[in-house]
Amino acid sequence: MTNFMDKRYSRRRFIKSAALTAAGLSLGPYINLGKAHASEPMKRVMGRLDFEVTTLGLGGQASLQWTPVDVDPIKIILKAFDSEVNYFDTSNVYGPSQSYYSKAFRQLNLIPGQPGYNERLRRSIFLTSKTALRFGKGGWQKPGLINVSNGTGRHAADDLRRTLSLVFGDGQGSYPKGAYLDMVLMHSISGMPDVDAVYEGYESTDPRAETIGALAALIDFRDGTNLTGLNPGEEKLIRHIGFSGHASPPVMIEMIQRDSRRILEGMLVAINANDRNYFNMQYNVIPVAEANNMGVIAMKVFADGAMYAKAATWTSIPDMVVLGVGSDILPSRRLIEYSLTTPGIHTAIIGIGHIDDDAAACQLKQNLLAAQIKPDALSVSDRRDIEKLALTAKEGKTNYFQNPI
């Protein structure tokens, strides 16, 4: 174990190449490592977040949420660290995902207050969680409003503390001094009721109000203030605030435009090679986020596995998790390149179903190699060619989560 940890703390260099295509790679479903050379993972600056992020981040779903019996999700997280991935994603609606991070973080000495706490390593990564609870206080119901959590709390601060306890604390509500999240996203902003709810009390915060939205509450926990009356200890538990969305570009644009104080610094958005078959993100909300200098994270690169054998529906059981690497007809590399060359995108989070000592069979290694691409590496013609490839997946009808044109 000592040698294992020493390698990890030195941030072991991983085989990568910024010119993989020129290295003469296979056109098959996986990348041949034979001619790749060692270099550090490619990074991009995440807008106003001002963090140099690796172009691949670890998604908090796949085997971290729906864990097959023969998969160890903790090893997936540790392998991502070994591979120098520095963006890590989870959520309060991802089942055991946050608890798996806790087990990995304890091996990595990332728990504040514990002997050997590695603060330098903690500062080198970006940990994001999410809350789909729309209110900081009170609340109301409207058709279409998403307001859910895997926890027992009813409000955004409950989810925030739940994450800190599950990842850094005892899992029962307590968390150590010095624990924090780099960002909290308001999860799956899908309709105008979601926007209206989170913005309650944003312009004029009154602690006497019956209802206060999630955003005003999260601002208090970012700034260490108590304008809402919901943070009496004036704790500073998060560094940045953002939101995620899969469905509606107009709703997501409204989310950004209503933010007169420029609080929102990050956006997690569904973007893949079938995007233009739907009410697309790449020509609508992503340019708005880019114009606001937000950090933009791509998700659903493989349409939650629907680009391959999985049905075009939400994953709900471990048997639905995709364990393979691409296909001969639709190489995963091309889909990753598409998302990462979409203007405005800084990184892509991809959930991992399976890791392997065989590089050709290891989703994490293959995804990381494919992510070594510059933002302008593909021409418009190149991107259209990838879109044609993506049409071979269910005739392009993969993005069940995205609104139609």
Description of each model-found segment:
Residues M1-S10, K35:
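N-terminal secretory signal peptides
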Residues Y9-G28:
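N-terminal export leaders
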Residues M46, S260-I263, N280-I405:
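Structured C-terminal cap/extension of enzyme domains
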Residues T90-L108, G191-P193:
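Glycine-rich, proline-tolerant flexible connector loops at the mouths of alpha/beta enzymes
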Residues M46, L58, F88, L127, ...:
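Conserved, mostly hydrophobic/aromatic
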Residues G60-D70, Q141-H155, D319-S327:
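Active-site mouth loops of central-metabolism enzymes
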Residues I146-A273, E290, M294-I297:
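Glycine/proline-rich, positively charged
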Residues P29-G60, K374, S379:
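C-terminal segment of N-terminal export signals and the immediately downstream linker at the start
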